[in-house]
Amino acid sequence: MNFETIIGLEVHVELKTNSKIFSASPTEFGADPNTQTSVIDLGYPGVLPTLNKEAVNFAMKAAMALNCEIATETKFDRKNYFYPDNPKAYQISQFDKPIGQNGWIEIEVGGQKKRIGITRLHLEEDAGKSTHTGEGYSLVDYNRQGLPLIEIVSEPDMRTPEEAYAYLEKLKSIIQYTGVSDCKMEEGSLRCDANISLRPVGQEKFGTKAELKNLNSFTYVQKGLEFEQARQEKELLSGGIIQQETRRYDEATKKTILMRVKEGSDDYRYFPEPDLVELYIDEEWKEQVRASIPELPDARKARYVAELGLPAYDAHVLTLTKEMSDFFEETVAGGADAKLASNWLMGEVLAYLNKQQKELKDVALTPAGLSKMIQLIEKGTISSKIAKKVFNELIEKGGDPEEIVKAKGLVQISDEGTLRKIVTEILDNNAQSIEDFKNGKDRAIGFLVGQIMKATKGQANPPLVNKILLEEINKR
């Protein structure tokens, strides 16, 4: 029997506002525990929440970027549950009137494009953070309590873990472009839960789902779904029954582990938040927010292909993150050739960042520096090989490419007379290589070029070297 995998994702995104959603408490990450709280966050008797308009603007902006319909009437509700990191014993969220719904984004996997539906996007407040010491007690930090969140619930439209990974990558990219969140999973500003079930191919009814938690990276989302997919298939093929469970992904064993069995759906006893009035969003407000949405990744990707002549793959990689795309834009605006800028960013720059586990903002390289270096290559002042030495200096220490070239004596040798003299000396000392080349051994020319580059410390103009070398060989 063959099975079809059904995957849906719930993503929580922390909004980058200066204050919390219902209080004036600050939102800075990394502050000392319990130093960014207020009586409103902690639910003291008699205090009243005040809605942060910027959080509403950010939620609308994200919803619009995700092609959602924006509600004209929306409201907040109390979601009732008790947990130590929830001091009010309820969370202010949205139940039946979310701020956005019926959206979609387009992903691409294996060259195939697919539209993934978004059921809803709603606003809510975050809970505090519990730390379990393992010594008989737990600690709670309420700094996170009351931070503004949007929850983005997808339709169960994904059929493979690869599609789930692509969805998350695209979702993160769009949200980052809007500027409403930095989407840093390591800081908790983007969190994801996954729901997965299997059903026989051709069957319309969904199978029993498992919910996966503790997914701390997009890679873990994919790996957790892959394991769960295999686990459920094995269970069904052996005649077993899938129970509705909450499971967590264990990074060490690369398996999902049972947390609890769900006998029914959670009953949070939602009811309208009595301390907040309904919110009415008119067309003028919507248009103001819509006008603030910048160029999004798909539009940039199309522009890079149409106007800059980049291959679709290059355009895709460059627009994955706004940081990289903005860096590319500034590099080209500084006068660098678009394709050369793309090659350097996708090659040397990404390789360095991946190796050092850094982001562009963490290195000394600037768009202006990269642009000037590329223009030195285009002018023939330095070769691509020498440029790598300049690049290493720029990304580690910064500086002006022209000054680095002069200080290190890296100017490319393009004087024909100087190069011809060096070529002649190399040929005089390598008669056998000349003979090998004339006998059809093409590798011999590579050896000779290598000797010339060694003699010039890599500073010889490669095209000119090849030209002179062939001329001098043909004379012999």
Swiss-Prot record:
InterPro entries: Asn/Gln-tRNA_amidoTrfase_suB/E, Asn/Gln-tRNA_Trfase_suB/E_cat, Asn/Gln_amidotransferase, Asn/Gln_tRNA_amidoTrase-B-like, GatB, GatB_C_1, GatB_Yqey_C_2, Gln-tRNA_amidoTrfase_suB_CS. GO terms for molecular function: asparaginyl-tRNA synthase (glutamine-hydrolyzing) activity; ATP binding; glutaminyl-tRNA synthase (glutamine-hydrolyzing) activity. Disulfide bonds: none annotated. One of its GO terms (biological process) is glutaminyl-tRNAGln biosynthesis via transamidation. It comes from the Bacteria. The keyword Phosphoprotein does not apply. It catalyses: L-glutamyl-tRNA(Gln) + L-glutamine + ATP + H2O = L-glutaminyl-tRNA(Gln) + L-glutamate + ADP + phosphate + H(+); L-aspartyl-tRNA(Asn) + L-glutamine + ATP + H2O = L-asparaginyl-tRNA(Asn) + L-glutamate + ADP + phosphate + 2 H(+). Keywords: ATP-binding, Ligase, Nucleotide-binding, Protein biosynthesis. SMART domains: GatB_Yqey. The keyword Mitochondrion does not apply. Its EC number is 6.3.5.-. Heterotrimer of A, B and C subunits. Allows the formation of correctly charged Asn-tRNA(Asn) or Gln-tRNA(Gln) through the transamidation of misacylated Asp-tRNA(Asn) or Glu-tRNA(Gln) in organisms which lack either or both of asparaginyl-tRNA or glutaminyl-tRNA synthetases. The reaction takes place in the presence of glutamine and ATP through an activated phospho-Asp-tRNA(Asn) or phospho-Glu-tRNA(Gln). Belongs to the GatB/GatE family. GatB subfamily. This is Aspartyl/glutamyl-tRNA(Asn/Gln) amidotransferase subunit B. The lineage of its organism: Bacteria, Bacillati, Bacillota, Bacilli, Bacillales.
